[in-house]
């Protein structure tokens, strides 16, 4: 077991990225356009270009006069991110992008194509302060929070890439990249509102197709429920007992398993949405039959039918001595959880060979 890192809830104070059109709510966009001396309909045009046509470069917004393009480009569409590197695997069906921000901060997103859907896994922070010892992101520490626009640019880029390369459409968004989304709460919630708002106010993606993941910040889970966004909540539990979880998921020293599950139940009750429980299966660490039994009992008692367990075969990370559980152990774990009346499946792992799978993102390069 590596030496534990400290938990970091508050990101280091760094200069904010320049204000971008995507940072602004509808009323703020209207005010920003008015401040430029432009008529209100220009704001709607800009929103349609960004969220509808997926254009972030004003020089390509051909329904605007050249002078207006220059004006809004300088004031509302600064260059935020550079795609510093893109790599593929899974026969081109998985693509990881290394993003470099204007302050040289780096983070990653992953686009995954499936026969029935296209999913982008996006980051909410550069790095992560939750210090989970089996996760490369957590072991790298927290650099800073991402702005709302930096989060949304990952979505816009993936949507445009799918459309332009193959005429496809982005169908699912998961906040499972770098960072703890609920530790960057306000910007993540603002991003979700833009993602789910209908065009031209947002990207028009169904809330049911958006997943927000957390290691278990119980008060923030309850707060998210009160937002009534109706996105899917995913809780990275990884073990049902406090003794092991205190080490595997250090935030458990602040909010214990039962408190996290109670918050998840509150979320399920308010939204009517089934909660996803993420469980990275680690050989001889958290894969024992009794832990499968305890997991099934606790989830059935707390969440009833409003829960599903996603088992994740542990993905390798640099310097780690841990590895995934053998397939027979994995199958027995699934059987035991299901025997307690809880839905349980094994996640299809993508991107392992390019360090794009769950727990592997480290923004190196």
From Swiss-Prot:
Name used for this protein in its record: Probable dual-specificity RNA methyltransferase RlmN
Cellular-component GO terms for this entry: cytoplasm
HAMAP family attached to this UniProt entry: RNA_methyltr_RlmN
CDD domains given in the database record: Radical_SAM
Co-factor remark: Binds 1 [4Fe-4S] cluster. The cluster is coordinated with 3 cysteines and an exchangeable S-adenosyl-L-methionine.
Primary residence: cytoplasm
Positions that bind S-adenosyl-L-methionine: 179-180, 213, 236-238, 315
Gene Ontology MF term list: 4 iron, 4 sulfur cluster binding; metal ion binding; rRNA (adenine(2503)-C2-)-methyltransferase activity; rRNA binding; tRNA (adenine(37)-C2)-methyltransferase activity; tRNA binding
GO-annotated biological processes: rRNA base methylation; tRNA methylation
Name of encoding gene: rlmN
Compartments reported by the entry: Cytoplasm
